[in-house]
Swiss-Prot record:
InterPro entries: Ribosomal_bL17, Ribosomal_bL17_CS, Ribosomal_bL17_sf
Pfam families: Ribosomal_L17
NCBIfam families to which the protein is assigned, alphabetical: L17
Biological processes per GO annotation: translation
Organism of provenance: Shewanella pealeana (strain ATCC 700345 / ANG-SQ1)
Protein name: Large ribosomal subunit protein bL17
Sequence similarity: Belongs to the bacterial ribosomal protein bL17 family.
GO cellular component, one term: cytosolic large ribosomal subunit
Length: 130
């Protein structure tokens, strides 16, 4: 029975899953939007949102915790200098999942996962309005 077991297995062993979500979390912090399957996007929220909450209060201890979870100094720098201050007033819900159809090869449901309030999104809306 799988009672009280949270999270999805995604047909991977635990180390592969941990490495995959670590890499995806680094990618979403760098690019602020990535395209992936819906199941992976929903699981990625559980990794990224606590990182951003950690970045809202800048301290050496929090930077070390973020580095332990991402293993990327560039990503930790962006988290604490850009994303933490940007989401200072928001009490959670830092990501948005937008479904975007099915993948060509295997019809897997795909989605964009993006950070809420990213600057590029506002510019794109203005361009399409003109």
């Amino acid at each position: 029975m799988r009672h009280r077991k949270s999270g999805r297995q995604l047909n991977r062993n635990s180390s592969h899953r941990q490495a995959m979500f670590r890499n995806m979390a680094c990618s979403i912090v760098r690019h602020e939007v990535i395209k992936t399957t819906v199941a992976k996007a929903k699981e990625l929220r559980r990794v990224v949102e606590p990182l951003i909450t950690l970045a809202k209060s800048d301290s050496v201890a929090n930077r070390r915790l973020a580095f332990a979870r991402t293993r990327d100094a560039e990503v930790v720098g962006k988290l604490f200098t850009e994303l933490g201050p940007r989401f200072q007033e928001r009490p959670g819900g830092y990501t948005r999942i937008l479904k975007c159809g099915l993948r060509t090869g295997d019809k897997a449901p795909m989605a964009y996962i993006e950070l809420v309030g990213r600057p590029e999104a506002a510019e794109a809306v203005e361009d399409t309005a003109e």
